[in-house]
Amino acid sequence: NTDFGYYKVTIDRPARLKAQFTDERIAELRFDKSLKEPMKWAYETFGEKVYTELGKLEKELLEWCDKSGLDLTAKHRKELYSPAHWEKYSVLLGMAKMLKQEIGDDIYSDFNLFREKVEQAVKKHKIKPSASQLNVILNEVSWYDETAEKVIKKTEKLIGDKLNKLLHHLDCTAEQLPDFGYFPSGKKDEFIIYETQTDLRDSENVPLNESIHDYFLREVKPHVPEAWIDLDKTKIGYEISFNKYFYQHKPLRSIEEVSSEIVALEDESEGLIMDILNLS
């Protein structure tokens, strides 16, 4: 029944990131985020011994975790006492230090340019971080800023059958593609797809008997011009609005009825005051 159904529609916005290599930011790469507290305490307490004498430090580290109320899972406990796990993050830190030395500590308002420079430095120094390692480094030295440039995920050529299939899937025209996350690049038949800022992601409940795109144009785009619909994440739900279907409206009383009631209450309260003061 369309009266009770709705589309739960995901609304995305582009990532806008600034980036900068600083000693403070890259220092955090020494530690696994899920084990930051115990790893940081161990390094600040024992220094480089965590890389050479970790086995000897296990007892003290375990006692500190217990005193600090850290209830580590078996997996995390194993990683905390693993020299290879510590070395993994030390290597990550070393890569970041090399990149900082090459790129400097300038603030970049265009993350696309910053990422390009990082990739050039990686090739120049012939280091081979995995995609996940590079992402960890980039995430550590970047942050959202609404004044920064939008971060490009990829560009895509859309022509012929590929374009027609997409337009059919989205039920839109080529001119409406930006409302679904495909933005013209300025080059013929080329579209930009931006990275999404997940913490700005929102959702809208759209009645089943209404067009998702029409709703977006009316309720979302005027307030967030750079937002778009992620149609593939759309879900269908149902709810019953008891107020809408079962509430029985009671008409307001007339002014005359209310006025006469007020006068009666005033007379009653005046008589009560007279009784209290023994004036009657």
Question: Where in this protein do the model-derived segments appear?
Answer:
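A conserved structural/catalytic subdomain of Rossmann-like adenosyl-cofactor enzymes
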Residues: 1-272
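Coiled-coil heptad-register positions
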Residues: 273, 277-280
